[in-house]
Swiss-Prot record:
GO terms for molecular function: serine-type endopeptidase inhibitor activity. Transmembrane segments: none annotated. It comes from Fowlpox virus (strain NVSL) (FPV). It holds the Pfam family Serpin. Belongs to the serpin family. Poxviruses subfamily. One of its GO terms (cellular component) is extracellular space. Keywords: Protease inhibitor, Serine protease inhibitor. InterPro entries: Serpin_CS (IPR023795), Serpin_dom (IPR023796), Serpin_fam (IPR000215), Serpin_sf (IPR036186), Serpin_sf_1 (IPR042178), Serpin_sf_2 (IPR042185). Signal peptide: none annotated. This is Uncharacterized serpin-like protein FPV044.
Length: 358
């Protein structure tokens, strides 16, 4: 049977590996990744793939061996759905209408209730992308090269905080050593877990969402050099380590001031899969016998992730009241990493970077 520990290992691997590869491609951009979303995509591709394509997915992403045991697969889906229970997500598997689709795969998709199977031409795909607010460039790329198959996965998360954030004027944020911007800030205060982790040269603060269902871990360094060190050394082992677990943090009254941000990123993660060595599903001679008797390949694999930072609509009236609450003040004014975890299982739901909050 699938278990939470096994799934957590895979989610931590996806978090750090995709973060690393996307950062290499766009080092100066904000990033947000939803590992459960990527795991659901890979499970869908595993179900569709055969032979070498399947083995590439299993070997390089260390995914769960799928689905000779339907109960095992169902349990995995159940856990992933629970992790995403407070998010909004839409998954579409588009296949060109000239390709036949096995009834058995249609039944699998219907039973899993995770993705929608859409058959049509490029106009149908573009309409779906438009409904999901994809950018013009990605829509044009689909028109220039009509796809045999595309996957669209959109996920959004926004929630209230256990300790409300309030507006906190505007302050300098040092995007780089040579670029400074003045951006709106928000502030909160409460009994939060916090620590300094020498292994990654980073401060860590745990800020719970309402009802403590999820928490956001903030990883931030005091210098650019140490932030680069953090990016290089934040591994699956670190994300899963009990050293940074909430039970091992110091709890005291602190105030935390951070840039007010809402982050949305859109990636065609096909290039990330290819860099990981997963190439067969994108090859023109790819055979997805579980889906169709006809040959077709995945042309594009779009993932759009969004995390909204809600400040509970409270306006800060007097800055001094926050200064009186605590002598421990954290003012984050350089790039930082955030990780949103599902507290019941300790699973990573989102991992991202704020490079430029503007």
């Amino acid at each position: 049977m699938s278990n939470v520990s096994s799934i957590n290992n895979k989610l931590a691997f996806i978090s750090t590996k995709f973060y690393e590869l996307i950062t290499k491609r766009i080092p100066d951009k904000n990033i947000v990744i939803s590992p459960p979303s990527i795991m659901l995509i890979v499970k869908m591709l595993l179900k569709a793939s055969t032979d070498r394509s399947r083995n590439q997915l299993l070997d390089l992403l260390y995914m769960l061996p799928l689905d000779d045991d339907e109960d095992d697969d169902s349990n995995t889906d159940k856990i992933l759905k629970e992790l995403l229970s407070r998010t909004e997500y839409t998954s579409i598997f588009f296949i060109d209408h000239n390709k036949r689709i096995h009834d058995s795969y249609k039944k699998y998709v219907s039973k899993s209730n995770i993705t929608s199977l859409v058959s049509g031409d490029v106009t149908v795909l573009c309409n779906k992308m438009s409904e999901l607010n994809y950018n013009t460039e990605d829509m044009l790329s689909s028109i220039r090269k009509p796809p045999e198959a595309s996957i669209l996965f959109n996920i959004k998360y926004s929630d209230l905080w256990e300790s409300p954030f309030s507006d906190n004027d505007s302050h300098k944020f040092f995007v780089t050593k040579y670029l400074t911007k003045v951006v709106p800030y928000i502030i909160t205060s409460g009994m939060f877990g916090h620590m300094y982790c020498h292994e990654i040269k980073s401060n860590i603060i745990n800020i719970p969402y309402l009802h403590n269902t999820y928490s956001m871990l903030l990883f931030f360094a005091d210098t650019y050099k140490n932030f680069k060190y953090l990016e290089k050394h934040i591994t699956p082992r670190i994300l899963l380590s009990s050293k940074i677990g909430v039970s091992n943090m110091k709890y005291s009254e602190i105030s935390v001031s951070i840039p007010k941000f809402s982050i949305q990123t859109q990636h065609n993660i096909k290039s990330v899969f290819v860099e990981l060595g997963i190439t067969d599903i994108f090859d023109e001679n790819c055979s997805m016998k579980s889906v169709s008797p006809d040959k077709f390949s995945i042309t594009s694999l779009f993932v759009k992730s969004q995390v909204d930072f809600i400040n509970n609509k409270i306006v800060l009236g007097d800055q001094k009241k926050w200064e009186k609450i605590s002598n421990n003040n954290y003012h984050i004014n350089r790039p930082f990493i955030f990780v949103i975890k599902y507290n019941k299982t300790g699973s990573v739901v989102f991992m991202g970077k704020i490079k430029d909050p503007e």
